UniProtKB/Swiss-Prot annotation:
InterPro entries: Integrase-like_N (IPR017856), TACO1_YebC-like_2nd/3rd_dom (IPR048300), TACO1_YebC_N (IPR049083), Transcrip_reg_TACO1-like (IPR002876), Transcrip_reg_TACO1-like_dom3 (IPR026564), YebC-like (IPR029072). It is found in: Cytoplasm. The keyword Transcription applies. GO terms for cellular component: cytosol. Gene3D superfamilies: 1.10.10.200, 3.30.70.980. This is Probable transcriptional regulatory protein STH1004. Keywords: Cytoplasm, DNA-binding, Transcription, Transcription regulation. It comes from the Bacteria. GO terms for molecular function: DNA binding. GO terms for biological process: regulation of DNA-templated transcription. The keyword Transcription applies. Belongs to the TACO1 family.
Length: 242
């Protein structure tokens, strides 16, 4: 009985931790969308998709509205700076981060500590940004898509997309940043559910890492993504599963 209860407690703690991580990620998506396109989901399609993901995850409406207000700067009591950090991870991979913080010094110290403790180094502005290109990225769950790949590609290209990449369980549609909203709206009109859409920094070339370097890199990326002030993390790593 006692051991069973301990197992139940551990399982619940793990589920709570996973739920908290999901809420944290979605909150960051909502804040970013509201910051870039405003607080109205009816006119900001990126925000509409992020809010839909929040509701699907059973995030309380109070949390959703707070994230929108913070992202759009509607809360006059809070002032945030937006910063881009660049650096190198194990194996020489490039890493870029979008930061939103109310204390630049605290965040810089935290991020520098995470890098140095896990085989990386925080660099100067511009040290790796030339290895990335800003693009719109739309993620679609293949299992939720009512049409085939060819039809999906035709709809996306007609709407202004640049490319479609097929993954094991999903599709990734790439657009110019200013075409992202338009393509997402056309997909919705065609009955294609969009899992996520964002303007992201996509690497133009990749660096292969494996073994201990890959493990160390994954730990570094996880810790960066878990930090409250880090909105997005991008890397040009090609991580081998071997």
């Amino acid at each position: 009985m006692g051991r069973k209860w301990e197992n139940i407690k551990r399982s619940k703690a793990k589920l709570d931790q996973q739920r908290g991580a999901t809420f944290s990620r979605i909150t960051k998506d909502i804040m970013k969308a509201a910051r870039e396109g405003g607080p109205d989901p009816e006119t900001n399609f990126l925000l509409k998709v992020a809010v839909a993901a929040a509701r699907k995850a059973n995030m309380p409406n109070e949390n959703i509205q707070r994230a929108i207000a913070r992202g759009a700067g509607l809360d006059s009591a809070e002032r945030f700076d937006e910063i881009v950090y660049e650096g190198y991870g194990p194996g020489g991979v490039a890493i870029m981060m979008n930061i939103v913080t109310d204390n630049r010094n605290r965040t810089a110290a935290d991020v520098r500590h995470i890098f140095s403790k896990h085989g990386g180094s925080l660099g100067e502005t511009g040290c790796v940004s030339w290895m990335f290109k800003k693009r719109g990225v739309i993620e679609i769950d293949r299992g939720e898509t009512p049409i085939g790949e060819d039809d999906l590609m035709m709809i996306a290209l007609d709407a202004g997309a640049e490319d479609l990449v097929t993954e094991e369980d999903s599709y990734a549609i790439y657009t110019a940043p200013d075409a992202l909203n338009q393509v997402m709206k056309q997909l919705e009109a065609a009955g294609v559910p969009v899992e996520k859409g964002e303007v992201a920094m996509v690497p133009t070339t990749t660096v292969a890492v494996s073994g201990e370097e890959a493990e160390q890199l994954m730990r570094l990326l996880d810790l960066l993504e878990e930090h409250d002030d880090v909105q997005n993390v991008y890397t040009n790593a090609d991580i081998s599963e071997a």
